[in-house]
Amino acid sequence: MSQGDTVPLHPSSQSDIDEIENLINESVQSGPGTVLAARPPSPTRPSIPVSSSSSSSPFMQSNLPPLHPSSSAQKVTHVPVPPPLPAVSNSSNFQGASAFGSPPNTLTEPVWDTVKRDLSRIVSNLKLVVFPNPYREDPGKALRDWDLWGPFFFIVFLGLTLSWSASVKKSEVFAVAFALLAAGAVILTLNVLLLGGHIIFFQSLSLLGYCLFPLDVGAVICMLKDNVILKMVVVSVTLAWSSWAAYPFMSSAVNPRRKALALYPVFLMYVSVGFLIIAIN
């Protein structure tokens, strides 16, 4: 491109170029020893005051108590120790056997402790059945802890008393008395169950055996006093006593409309035992 083809610059651009050239020429003429003036320092900025005291703090105060790192880091919870259990005696073991729960272990106890426990149970059941008490109308409470040792003892004792009272054939008298009482108790229990009675089989045997206690007392008195009139009076009293002891338990076990069917055989068996006491001489 030739010089004739150049495009002229805008007046403002030409003035800027001229100003730049003038500044360059002035810097060259002034020489290298000239130092330009330094930029003035900027004004200091205001600083935020920081105080260590809590009263001049710009933040809002909290009502929460300060945390202690030592107590929060090592927090120990104290668990209360339960009191020791009281000592259990032998008498409490016997009471626990008749309540709900597992019975106490009696395999390692002395023989004398077992005998004492059985004797105390026999005496307790005898009081509940024969003698007046508030539980006579409730057979479930009266014979809850039933046993067969007491009835077995009263049956054997009555048979021995009758055999001692007999002058001849003592062994036959004992066999007849024992068979009559044992078979009679089983038959009477089956009779109550067939009538729809709500009673346990062995509980009924225990009840009928304990009700023989008055007849045992009457047999001992008749053995000591050989008098027919005295025998009749004693047997009548003891027969009524035994029937009175068995009445509430047997009557409450069956339907009220079948009460006579359950009580009549019981009364008949006790009457048979009474005739044996009077007849044996």
Curated annotation (Swiss-Prot):
Residues 1-147, 250-259 are cytoplasmic. GO terms for molecular function: protein homodimerization activity. Residues 47-65 have a biased composition (Low complexity). One of its GO terms (cellular component) is trans-Golgi network. It comes from the Eukaryota. One of its GO terms (biological process) is plant organ development. Residues 169-172, 215-228, 281 are lumenal. It is found in: Golgi apparatus, trans-Golgi network membrane. Residues 1-15 have a biased composition (Polar residues). The keyword Kinase does not apply. The chain crosses the membrane at residues 148-168, 173-193, 194-214, 229-249, 260-280. It is a multi-pass membrane protein. Keywords: Cell wall biogenesis/degradation, Golgi apparatus, Membrane, Protein transport, Transmembrane, Transmembrane helix, Transport. Disruption phenotype: No visible phenotype. The double mutant yip4a yip4b exhibits disturbed trans-Golgi network (TGN)-Golgi association and cell elongation defects leading to reduced roots and hypocotyls growth associated with an abnormal cell wall composition and a mislocalization of trans-Golgi network (TGN)-localized proteins SYP61 and VHA-a1. The double mutant yip4a yip4b also has a reduced number of root trichoblasts displaying Rho-of-plant (ROPs e.g. ARAC4/ROP2, ARAC5/ROP4 and ARAC3/ROP6) patches and leading to an almost complete absence of root hairs. Strongly reduced ROP2 plasma membrane localization. Residues 1-88 are annotated as: Disordered. Disulfide bonds: none annotated. Expressed in developing root hair cells. The keyword Transport applies. Together with YIP4B, involved in the regulation of cell elongation during root and hypocotyl growth. YIP4A and YIP4B are central trafficking components in Rho-of-plant (ROPs, e.g. ARAC4/ROP2, ARAC5/ROP4 and ARAC3/ROP6) small GTPases-dependent root hair formation, thus contributing to activation and plasma membrane accumulation of ROPs during hair initiation. The ECH/YIP4 complex is involved in the modulation of the trans-Golgi network (TGN)-mediated trafficking of some proteins and cell wall components (e.g. Belongs to the YIP1 family. Homodimer and heterodimer with YIP4B. Component of a trans-Golgi network (TGN)-localized ECH/YIP4 complex made of ECH, YIP4A and YIP4B. Interacts directly with ECH. This is Protein YIP4a. The lineage of its organism: Eukaryota, Viridiplantae, Streptophyta, Embryophyta, Tracheophyta. The gene is YIP4A.
